[in-house]
Amino acid sequence: MDTHGEKMKNLEIKKHSRGDLLLLRSSDLHSFRKLQREVDKMGLLSSAEQHLSGILTTLENVADQDNTLYCLTQRGELIGMLKIGTKRLYLYNGKDLHCRSCACLLDFYIRRDFRKRGLGLELFNFMLRDKAISPSRLCYDNPSHKLRSFLKKHFSPCALIKQPNNFVIFAEYFGEPEAAPFER
């Protein structure tokens, strides 16, 4: 079995913001197109695994919608991704409906042949540190059973509450002081 050091060998996490992608597209179209092919392929895999008709994540929609994409690579090959962005949502706390600008996890995918190695947790924790946010302050866009299990395993105890808009929040979401949406 791999040790943690061996698992993380040759791995890199890269953050791509809208500005980064627009700059890459204008300055190095070849590199942009290569990244686009990899991200679009992984977005297709993510959507297929969730039985969705459309693709949640393409490089174009990351740039167009002002989201942030975290890419996990091994020896330059994309093996995982996490997309996060800000959405204006109506959230129900059990009594009242609140309209807020919320930090949202929009897509999260690790290639099948790289799962069960702790790499998803590494990627998720990298994003949390980068955005200076706790998992309970995120809204999760229609999370799959696998993502719900991941959250319960790594951030237990956590009770997840489904919202009418198909987002899911932690039960303590409203118990914490409201923070400003993260900086992009």
UniProtKB/Swiss-Prot annotation:
What is an annotated GO biological process for this record, any one? regulation of microtubule cytoskeleton organization
Query: Coiled-coil annotation: which residues?
Result: none
Q: Which domain of life is it from?
A: Eukaryota
Q: Where does acetyl-CoA bind?
A: 108-121, 144-153
A Pfam cross-reference name: Acetyltransf_16
SUPFAM superfamilies on file: Acyl-CoA N-acyltransferases (Nat) (SSF55729)
N-acetyltransferase domain sequence ranges: 1-174
Q: Which reaction does it catalyse?
A: L-lysyl-[alpha-tubulin] + acetyl-CoA = N(6)-acetyl-L-lysyl-[alpha-tubulin] + CoA + H(+)
Would the keyword Protein biosynthesis turn up in this protein's UniProt record?
no
One GO term in the molecular function aspect is:
tubulin N-acetyltransferase activity
Q: Which PROSITE patterns match?
A: GNAT_ATAT (PS51730)
Keywords, A to Z, come to:
Acyltransferase, Transferase
Supply the Gene3D superfamilies for this chain. 3.40.630.30
Asked if Transmembrane is a keyword of the record, the answer is no
The EC number(s) given in the record are 2.3.1.108
**Group of enzyme by EC:** transferase
Annotated site residues (Crucial for catalytic activity) in this chain: Q50
Q: Describe the family membership recorded for this protein in Swiss-Prot or TrEMBL.
A: Belongs to the acetyltransferase ATAT1 family.
What is this protein for, i.e. what is its function? Answer: Specifically acetylates 'Lys-40' in alpha-tubulin on the lumenal side of microtubules. Promotes microtubule destabilization and accelerates microtubule dynamics; this activity may be independent of acetylation activity. Acetylates alpha-tubulin with a slow enzymatic rate, due to a catalytic site that is not optimized for acetyl transfer. Enters the microtubule through each end and diffuses quickly throughout the lumen of microtubules.
The protein, known as: Alpha-tubulin N-acetyltransferase
Q: Which organism is it from?
A: Plasmodium vivax (strain Salvador I)
